[in-house]
A protein has these predicted regions:
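Flexible, glycine/proline-enriched loop segments at strand-loop-helix junctions
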Residues: 1-4
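ATP-dependent carboxylate activation and anion-phosphoryl transfer catalytic cores
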Residues: 80-157
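Phosphate-binding site of ATP-dependent enzymes
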Residues: 7-89, 115-117
Length: 157
């Protein structure tokens, strides 16, 4: 992943990307607050977790930030209640659109205009003790074993 800050750096970035594989994705950079939101649904309820804010001193939340401790994860996120609710509603809607099952996690950037922008959908989010979902589960006052039991029992009923 390369962040290009000036036009003269575009071609070298593209060349570098092609040296890694046959396809290249070019995206606009969106400056803002990065947040992530977990969600699951059963036949009789919807659970949308508190948001986690992702803060890093790196250019963006990359491999080093994620796996080498160069990130601060703040749950619940330090954003307005209105923005939180908007992200949670959007996460629930994405869950339904995808026909998801079990847990998902959706990542967003909230730029200066306050309108959340979808980054990616994680249909198999990390589940280690330090992953986002377990942090959000704890922030919601729940236990992972209860969440997992809920999801598993729903599939058998």
């Amino acid at each position: 992943v390369t962040k290009v800050k000036e036009a003269s750096a575009i071609q070298p970035a593209i060349d570098k990307a092609f040296s890694e594989g046959r396809e290249v994705v070019i995206e606009s950079f969106i400056d803002g607050t990065e947040v992530t939101c977990g969600c699951y649904k059963t036949a009789d309820k919807e659970v949308v977790f508190p948001l986690t804010e992702v803060v890093t001193d790196n250019e963006f939340f990359d491999f080093d930030a994620k796996y080498n401790g160069q990130v601060q994860e703040i749950t619940p996120a330090r954003i307005s209640a209105e923005q939180t609710e908007k992200v949670q509603r959007e996460t629930s809607r994405i869950y339904d659109i995808l026909g998801a099952k079990g847990l998902i996690r959706v990542d967003y950037i909230i730029p200066a205009d306050g309108e959340p922008k979808l980054l990616e959908v994680n249909t198999t989010p990390g589940m280690t003790a330090t992953s986002f979902i377990p942090q959000q589960v704890r922030a919601a006052g729940l236990e992972m074993k209860d969440v997992m039991t809920d999801i598993i029992e729903n599939e058998f009923n």
